[in-house]
Amino acid sequence: MTLQKKIIELLGVKPAIIPEIEIKNCVDFLKKYLVNHVHIKSLIVGVSGGQDSTLTAKLCQMTAETLRKEKNDITYQFIALRLPYGIQYDEKDCQDAIRFIQPDQIFNVNIKKAVLSSEKSLKKSGVIISDYVRGNEKARERMKVQYSIAAMKQGLVVGTGHAAENITGFFTKYGDSGTDINPIAKLNKRQIRLLLKNLNCPKHLYLKKPMADLEDEHPQQDDESVLGVTYDAIDSYLEQKKIDIRSQKIIEALYLNTLHKRNLPITQ
């Protein structure tokens, strides 16, 4: 078996999808988990204004609405979290995403003071962190806030991770990857766009250039520039299509070099 086939089998990506069916599958997946865990009453997503969190949040809102109707239980809620670091440059996109999602509840928590406080404490101990490490601190602080709210709201922290991120290891260990449940894990980027389009998401949101925007020294740097390969190539690879050798080598190197992120924790 080639490495490509092994990865595809492991991540469970389909070569083609029907958006309506995938939307139903994702909602049913979330519904089933909540029904089987009666103490959980809310779904929680950090909404950044990007494709992944917009889709995940919309699916969660649909799930909460469906459960309220089917179970005649108004306690099922979707909670959207806005977790900016200072002033977010694409705040308009975030607000447009919120209007599209129509969440039951919204909490706004600015993480900048917490991140800088942690950095200051480390500096006092003689540890000066790099801009790159600070970026990971932001991702972990956001996850910490989500779990704090989940604990107070009988909530489940829902991940926005997908197959194109997973294969490249383009996530923060114990940050955005540290979630309870991931409904879109088997989708690639173009499939995410298809689902958003099917749900009548504003075009500028589902066509938005993906970027993590974690590093202060490289603001608005898009994912593809960091990875050195396009999402189109990654998606085609995950759909078992032939791609150029250079892109294939980059993708497979990224996968192998980030195995430690997908196998946690390391045990004897």
UniProtKB/Swiss-Prot annotation:
One Pfam family this sequence matches: NAD_synthase
Entry-linked SUPFAM superfamilies: Adenine nucleotide alpha hydrolases-like
GO terms for MF: ATP binding; glutaminase activity; metal ion binding; NAD+ synthase (glutamine-hydrolyzing) activity; NAD+ synthase activity
The enzyme's E.C. designation: 6.3.1.5
Gene3D superfamilies: HUPs
Catalysis performed (reactions): deamido-NAD(+) + NH4(+) + ATP = AMP + diphosphate + NAD(+) + H(+)
Residues involved in deamido-NAD(+) binding: R140, K173, D180, H260, K261
Top enzyme category: ligase
Pathway: Cofactor biosynthesis; NAD(+) biosynthesis; NAD(+) from deamido-NAD(+) (ammonia route): step 1/1
Record's keyword terms, sorted: ATP-binding, Ligase, Magnesium, Metal-binding, NAD, Nucleotide-binding
One GO CC term on file: cytoplasm
Binding site for Mg(2+): D52, E165
Residue positions binding ATP: G46, V47, S48, G49, G50, Q51, D52, S53, T160, K189
One biological process term in Gene Ontology: NAD biosynthetic process
Subunit structure, interactors included: Homodimer.
NCBIfam families in alphabetical order: nadE, PRK00768.1
Function: Catalyzes the ATP-dependent amidation of deamido-NAD to form NAD. Uses ammonia as a nitrogen source.
Protein family (similarity comment): Belongs to the NAD synthetase family.
Name of the protein in its database record: NH(3)-dependent NAD(+) synthetase
Organism per entry: Buchnera aphidicola subsp. Acyrthosiphon pisum (strain APS)
Gene behind this protein: nadE
